Regions:
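C-terminal peripheral helix-coil segments that are non-catalytic and often amphipathic
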Residues: 2, 149-165, 169, 173-220
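An amphipathic alpha-helix adjacent to DNA-recognition modules
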Residues: 13-24, 33, 54-82, 92
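Short hydrophobic/aromatic patch on the recognition helix
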Residues: 44-55
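Short, hydrophobic secondary-structure boundary micro-motifs
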Residues: 36, 110-113, 121, 171, ...
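Basic, helix-initiating cap at the start of DNA-binding domains
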Residues: 1-43
């Protein structure tokens, strides 16, 4: 019975991988908005109805496919963090790497973190379980942070280091967290809608500047 269930799980993950990779190809070769059930099923080599055996709807499939970009981010993050001299540099380097990746793909990241995905809860964790063979060892150490689907929780977890080191008062933590997310979300939204004419480097630099000012305003 256990063997049968394992085989079913392996088969399920294999099929999901076919559809996820097909969706990723469409996003990269065409665009985010070009993804349709028909295109994905044709590219994967199955009929359209098969998709619904593994995904609730097209939105869930697209969400899974967007998570690939977090994998790329996690690999670069290891490099960005290695020269951090203190917790402040460590925190700012997390944001620097995150901004660089998300501002290159604003629609992907906005979809991942600022769109209502109630039905997709747990998708990030399931994605990394499906593609566990593709994750290198250094990236595995960052999985607890990466697996959090709520960007407020992700950032709050990182900010707690400032409280533990008596840099920020505990009572101000939630306000600071909210302020930083608003800064990032605003820049991401403006880039997504072509409301600003910033290069990725300039947008990242401005975001880091505002985050730094926010932290200093709450510093003990």
């Amino acid at each position: 019975m256990v063997i049968t269930m394992n085989k079913k799980l392996i088969q399920k993950r294999r099929m999901m991988k076919y559809f996820i990779e097909a969706t990723q190809q469409i996003i990269e070769k065409e665009s985010f908005d070009s993804v349709t059930v028909r295109k994905v099923s044709n590219l994967a080599g199955f009929n359209s109805a098969t998709i619904y055996n593994y995904f609730k709807n097209l939105n869930e499939l697209i969400y899974f496919s967007c998570i690939k970009y977090l994998e790329d981010y996690s690999k670069d993050l290891i490099i960005c963090l290695k020269d951090s001299k203190n917790i402040f540099e460590y925190y700012m380097n997390i944001w620097k790497c995150f901004c660089c990746h998300s501002y290159k793909n604003p629609k992907i990241y906005f979809h991942l973190f600022f769109t209502n995905h109630t039905l997709c809860k747990g998708s990030i964790k399931e994605y990394f379980e499906i593609f566990c063979d593709d994750i290198d060892e250094p990236s595995r150490k960052l999985l607890p942070m990466l697996l959090s689907e709520n960007i407020y929780d992700r950032n709050l977890s990182s900010l707690r280091n400032f409280v533990e080191n008596k840099i920020i008062n505990e009572k101000n933590l939630n306000d600071l967290n909210e302020m930083i997310i608003f800064i990032y979300q605003s820049m991401l939204y403006n880039i997504l809608n072509d409301s600003v004419d910033y290069s990725i480097d300039m947008a990242t630099e401005k975001t880091l500047k505002y985050i730094n000012q926010a932290i200093l305003s709450y510093k003990l």
